[in-house]
């Protein structure tokens, strides 16, 4: 398993992986709902490559992408120290340490950029993800009540964050 920063050459595989992960019904987009072409993904990746406090990390196994982590930074000086995280792992690789490895690589990268705060949201009933985030040091900061509607039911999201020390 290799964890690395994504390049625009990964755009097609990354788009496919994101669609696969969304089949879990635990992401913001419902299965099949995200409409992003490979070209749009490429442009998005090119834009993120130019931002000092943004990056995309991928987990690769035998030349196949099996996980991703978007670190989306900010440019205003008052919030430049934080990044918002979006993470996904292919179903058959969950529970095998891929998420831990992605976050470990993220933290190395973040410390080099003086990023202090990592933040994310997660569906409250996504117990495996919440457990992973707590295991690696994230804390629940609050609840976004009824923030998503999945299969006709309102569900809560948790705000979680981790403060890095360096």
Q: What are the residue ranges of the model-derived segments?
A:
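Conserved beta-strand segments that form the floor/walls of ligand-binding pockets within enzyme
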Residues: 58, 70, 84-88, 117-121, ...
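Acetyl-CoA-dependent GNAT
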Residues: 8, 34-92, 103, 109, ...
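A short beta-loop-alpha structural element at the N-terminal edge
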Residues: 2-16
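Glycine-rich acetyl-CoA-binding "A-motif" of GNAT/NAT acetyltransferases
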Residues: 64-67, 128, 154
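Helix-loop element at the rim of GNAT/NAT acetyltransferase active sites that forms part
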Residues: 16-32
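Terminal substrate-recognition subdomain of acyl/acetyltransferases
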Residues: 155-166
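Conserved catalytic-core motifs of GNAT/GCN5-like acyltransferases
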Residues: 79, 119-123, 134, 139-155
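Conserved GNAT acetyl-CoA-binding A-motif
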Residues: 103, 110-121
């Amino acid at each position: 398993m290799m964890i690395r920063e994504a390049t625009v050459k990964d755009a097609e595989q990354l788009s496919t992986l994101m669609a696969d992960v969304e089949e879990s019904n635990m992401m913001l987009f419902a299965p099949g709902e995200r409409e992003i072409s490979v070209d749009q993904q490429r442009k998005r990746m090119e834009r993120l490559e130019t931002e000092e406090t943004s990056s995309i990390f991928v987990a690769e196994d035998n030349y196949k992408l099996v996980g991703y982590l978007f670190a989306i930074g900010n440019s205003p000086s008052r919030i430049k120290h934080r990044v918002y995280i979006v993470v996904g792992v292919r179903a058959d690789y969950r529970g095998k340490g891929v998420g831990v490895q992605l976050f470990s690589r993220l933290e190395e990268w973040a410390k080099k950029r003086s990023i202090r705060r990592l933040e994310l949201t997660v569906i409250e009933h996504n117990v495996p993800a919440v457990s992973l985030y707590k295991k690696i040091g994230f804390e629940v900061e609050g609840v976004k009540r009824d923030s998503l509607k999945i299969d006709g039911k309102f569900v809560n999201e948790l705000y979680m964050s981790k403060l890095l020390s360096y």
